[in-house]
Amino acid sequence: METKLVREVMIPIEKYVKVKEEDSLYDVIQTLESYKTAHNGRAHRDAVVVGEDGKFIGKVTMIDIFRALEPNYNKINVEEIVEGGKGELTEEMITSAYKDFDFWVAPSKTICERGMAKKVSEVMHIPSDGEYIMEEESIEKALHLYVLGAHQPLIVKKGDAVTGMLRFGDVFEVIRRDLIAC
């Protein structure tokens, strides 16, 4: 297996979907849809959040959007539930939480209203240090970060500058190709 570097697989930041803090979730979805249409159906499922100066400040992922559209997720502590179950998320825990918190019972009209009202600044993810990876690192290191639970996608840097995004699916594709070549 030939070692690939992160910079060989990442999506350059200038080619990634960008939104601003003041945009609504509806705006995010529209921006993602426009990107998909302009790129022959190839879709990004998350967006980079940039400040007024155009510099990276965070990201909005599918999980961030789902949690914003269903506010009852804010009432539970997933880590606490998993730890209480000895590190496992069982069918019983999932069913119990689903019933106890009435997840996804709001009509789509309510979800539409939430999507229009929620701002990116309210739901965006501000990455921790463990979610950044340098361009010159190996794909294996990126895979290691993902397996240990890094919030997707990883943010790629060169020095102090954010230069790209590394999606889990793109890392998987590198490994898949290597396995097929065996």
Model-derived features with residue positions:
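DNA-contacting interfaces and partner/effector-binding or oligomerization modules
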Residues: 6-17, 21, 30, 41, ...
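Short, surface-exposed, polar/charged, turn-prone segments marking secondary-structure boundaries
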Residues: 37, 46-48, 75-78, 86-88, ...
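A glycine-centered beta-loop-beta connector
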Residues: 32, 41-63, 146-149, 154-169
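Residue-level detector of functional hotspots within protein domains
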Residues: 3-5, 33-35, 51, 106-109, ...
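Tandem CBS (Bateman) regulatory domains
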Residues: 1-15, 62-131, 143, 147, ...
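Short N-terminal micro-motifs specific to bacterial/archaeal maturation
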Residues: 16-19, 56, 114, 130-133, ...
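The conserved cystathionine-beta-synthase
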Residues: 19-43, 69-72, 132-150, 157, ...
